[in-house]
């Protein structure tokens, strides 16, 4: 991998020292778009990613999840629709998803000693619930989540139903299975994405 391509991987990422074949391909694709696509050049130049994973989404299909530093997420969002379109041309038959790389901090122990030695309170953004909610938002961006329902079956299993903005149905309908499979793989939780039921007009 050339030095300019390697620079697309964040300096503090373990992948920078030993990138996988997929990460090498993603770095090359980002650098190629930055070099050869005039309207993406300025936006992509400062952006780097942390790692990339390929995830099976069923029916023999795969998705590529690109993990990016949290401070860079806004920069990716500004060009995300165009960027994912261009990347999906390069990685044919695979959906490309961009998710911020977040750390979950463990819940503090209840012992008095740990309470006394705890220097700083755990930020809410580092809790398991907050990180899983943020992953949901990242996966479906720029589509807005308009509602959530937790369905508990008789056997105790839980499925989260996520309602997406009806206005975006045409642009993401074909990606819903990918969103569900990737979320399950990243969090271990079942999720079902759907759109509001529109009552028929009489």
Swiss-Prot record:
Chain's role: Component of the ribosome, a large ribonucleoprotein complex responsible for the synthesis of proteins in the cell. The small ribosomal subunit (SSU) binds messenger RNAs (mRNAs) and translates the encoded message by selecting cognate aminoacyl-transfer RNA (tRNA) molecules. The large subunit (LSU) contains the ribosomal catalytic site termed the peptidyl transferase center (PTC), which catalyzes the formation of peptide bonds, thereby polymerizing the amino acids delivered by tRNAs into a polypeptide chain.
Cytoplasm recorded as keyword: yes
Main location: cytoplasm
GO CC field: cytosolic small ribosomal subunit; small-subunit processome
Annotated compartments: Cytoplasm
Residue ranges, compositional bias (Polar residues): 10-20
Protein name: Small ribosomal subunit protein eS7
Matches recorded under InterPro entries: Ribosomal_eS7, Ribosomal_eS7_CS
One GO MF term: structural constituent of ribosome
Gene: crp-15
Organism of provenance: Neurospora crassa (strain ATCC 24698 / 74-OR23-1A / CBS 708.71 / DSM 1257 / FGSC 987)
Family: Belongs to the eukaryotic ribosomal protein eS7 family.
Biological process (GO), any one: rRNA processing
Subunit-level organization: Component of the small ribosomal subunit (SSU). Mature N.crassa ribosomes consist of a small (40S) and a large (60S) subunit. The 40S small subunit contains 1 molecule of ribosomal RNA (18S rRNA) and at least 32 different proteins. The large 60S subunit contains 3 rRNA molecules (26S, 5.8S and 5S rRNA) and at least 42 different proteins.
Keyword Cell wall biogenesis/degradation: no
Transmembrane feature ranges: none
The entry's keywords: Cytoplasm, Ribonucleoprotein, Ribosomal protein
Superkingdom field: Eukaryota
Region (Disordered): 1-20
């Amino acid at each position: 991998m050339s030095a300019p391509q390697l620079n697309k991987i964040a300096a503090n990422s373990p992948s920078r020292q030993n990138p996988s074949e997929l990460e090498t391909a993603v770095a090359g694709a980002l650098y190629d778009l930055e070099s050869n696509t005039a309207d993406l050049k300025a936006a992509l130049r400062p952006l780097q990613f942390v790692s990339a994973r390929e995830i099976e989404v069923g029916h023999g299909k795969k998705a590529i999840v690109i993990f990016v530093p949290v401070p860079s997420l806004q920069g990716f969002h500004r060009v995300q629709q165009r960027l994912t379109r261009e990347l999906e041309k390069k990685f044919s038959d695979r959906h490309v998803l961009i998710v911020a790389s977040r750390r979950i901090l463990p819940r503090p122990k209840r012992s008095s000693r740990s309470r006394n030695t705890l220097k700083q309170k755990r930020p809410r953004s580092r809790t398991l619930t907050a990180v899983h909610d943020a992953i949901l938002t990242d996966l479906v961006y720029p589509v807005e989540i308009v509602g959530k329902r937790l369905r508990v079956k008789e056997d105790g299993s839980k499925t989260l139903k996520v309602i997406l903005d009806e206005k975006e149905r045409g642009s993401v309908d074909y990606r819903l299975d990918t969103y569900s499979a990737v979320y399950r793989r990243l969090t271990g939780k079942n999720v079902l994405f759907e759109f509001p039921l529109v009552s028929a007009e009489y």
